[in-house]
Amino acid sequence: MKQYFITDQGKVRPHNEDAGGLFKNKADQTLSIVADGMGGHQAGDVASEMVKTYFANVWEATERIATPEEAEAWLKSHILKANTNVFQHAEQNPECRGMGTTVIVVIFMADQLSIAHIGDSRCYRYREDDLTQITDDHSLVNELVRSGQLSKQDAEYHPRKNVLMKALGTNPLVEPDVFSVAWQEGDRLIICSDGLTNKLTDQELKDYLATNESLRDIAKEMVNEANDRGGEDNITLALAEHSEAEEGDATC
């Protein structure tokens, strides 16, 4: 499998509240994570970094996961533990009150992906010239779209586009979306924060993923394009490709 991770502060924010990375367990299986933090007094970067570090540590101590069912159970259990950690930290530290983070976590197996997510960081799968968003945003505008009160086109420019219905760490309990999908030779996957998807359309993401360029080059071009269009937010993404080759690891 080829894989690449990149995070960028963007051109406007004073610091990077995104976090993420690619990590291996004891059986050399890969976990990918992206978290987009929120909260005043720089607490957003505390929340996202806490979640990233938690998943990195527990995954690196984990033995082989053999089935999607096992992966989903692992993900749900650790999302709940990470939520408790962030919520309690915010309760105990006044400067962190109200902090939280989106999170999307992917476990890669030979022919399956198991995914857990909360918030509006997204996962897309590119397969045979088709790009599919395989996560649902936990956002106000997405709820309005789903209920027929707003068109998908109008949602892109809605003034409350960034209002989340669900985030990790803002409440004592949280219910993540957890599911598995097929992962086959030639597939490409992207998980990303909204600093990317607020600047690049789904069609543009598809066009990038359809090229024969390396994942490193694709990722850097995406980040550069998002910054060229204003770069008002932090930009974070992890790319993966189902292939025999190995490529890259991570960059900041």
What kind of feature is each model-predicted range?
Residues 1-252:
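PP2C/PPM-type serine/threonine phosphatase catalytic domain
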